[in-house]
Each structure stands twice: as structure tokens, then as C-alpha cells.
Amino acid sequence: MAGNEKSRAKMEQAKGKAKEAAGRAVGNERMTAEGRAAQSKGDARQAKEKGKDVFRH
């Protein structure tokens, strides 16, 4: 289960980076902000999973 959540976090981070880059390329501030938000969500999920791992081992 934890592996699934970790891969989900990485996927959110990657999608966020891509969306942010696309937003910058076309000059769309909203898309850029949404990309940053997705990256932050992925970062938070990854931090949560790392915290869980600390208590498991």
C-alpha cells in the first residue's frame, strides 16, 4: 500500500511540473498556479509517507 502512495506522490509532482511548464510556455498564470499546487500536493503526500516509514522501521 505504501508503495502505491509513494508512486502516486511522484506522479502528482511530475504532473504538476509539466502543467507549470506548460502554463509558463503559453503565458497562462492560472495553469502555472495549478501546476505549483499539484507539486505541493505531491510533496505533502511524499512527506506523509516518509513519516509513516519512520514509524514502521
UniProtKB/Swiss-Prot annotation:
Composition bias type Basic and acidic residues, residue spans: 1-22, 42-57
InterPro entries: CsbD (IPR008462), YjbJ_sf (IPR036629)
Positions of the UniProt region annotated as Disordered: 1-57
One Pfam family from the record: CsbD
Domain of life: Bacteria
Family membership noted in the UniProt record: Belongs to the UPF0337 (CsbD) family.
UniProt protein name: UPF0337 protein SCO0678
Species per Swiss-Prot/TrEMBL record: Streptomyces coelicolor (strain ATCC BAA-471 / A3(2) / M145)
Upper classification of the organism: Bacteria, Bacillati, Actinomycetota, Actinomycetes, Kitasatosporales
